[in-house]
Curated annotation (Swiss-Prot):
UniProt key word Thylakoid: no
Protein name in UniProt: NADH-quinone oxidoreductase subunit I
First-level EC class: translocase
Family the entry assigns: Belongs to the complex I 23 kDa subunit family.
Cofactor stoichiometry and binding remark: Binds 2 [4Fe-4S] clusters per subunit.
Record field: catalytic activity: a quinone + NADH + 5 H(+)(in) = a quinol + NAD(+) + 4 H(+)(out)
This enzyme's EC code(s): 7.1.1.-
GO molecular function term, any single one: iron ion binding
InterPro entries recorded: 4Fe4S_Fe-S-bd, 4Fe4S_Fe_S_CS, NADH_quinone_OxRdtase_chainI
Length: 162
């Protein structure tokens, strides 16, 4: 580019006018912003949200205290304590998930041999203080009991890919 061409480009502000033209074109196009609480976008069927512990149909909890989920968790967000029952089966006495540490990777769900721990489609939960995001076994079982139909439907829909 010669010096004369550079002078005319600078003198007539062509770069500035190109930028203004681009801005003007996008000013009158439809916006892509979603007003979240009022408008909701579709959630992927494989979305990983709030955790839940499931039970069998007879009401017994599924977790066999194998501690695979605790071992595989990269964020070390899961804490499990167990004891042996009279019939020589292990069950959990403590199953805690710290959601402030959890990265929602889904490894706990993949490693569970009995599909006890699952990640639901729930994304709207909050805590006013740090302790509110520390889920105990009872809280996780309550989530599982409340949303069992949705969890079972999601598992059935995803069975082909597992």
């Amino acid at each position: 580019m010669t010096a004369i061409q550079q002078f005319f480009k600078t003198f007539f502000l062509t770069e500035l006018l190109k930028g203004l033209a681009l801005t003007g074109r996008y000013t009158f196009k439809r916006k892509f912003t979603v007003q979240f609480p009022e408008e909701k976008t579709p959630i992927s069927p494989r979305f990983r949200g709030l955790h839940a512990l499931r039970r069998y149909e007879n009401g017994e909890e599924r977790c066999i205290a194998c501690k695979l989920c605790e071992a595989v968790c990269p964020a070390m967000a899961i804490t499990i304590e167990s004891e042996t029952r009279a019939d020589n089966t292990r069950r959990t006495t403590r199953y805690d998930i710290d959601l402030t540490k959890c990265i929602f990777c889904g490894f706990c769900e993949e490693s569970c041999p009995v599909d006890s721990i699952v990640e639901t489609q729930i994304l709207e939960y909050h805590g006013e203080k740090r302790g509110d995001l520390y889920f105990t076994k009872e809280m996780l079982l309550a989530v599982g009991d409340r949303y069992e139909k949705e969890i079972a439907a999601a598992k059935a829909a995803d069975a082909r890919y597992r």
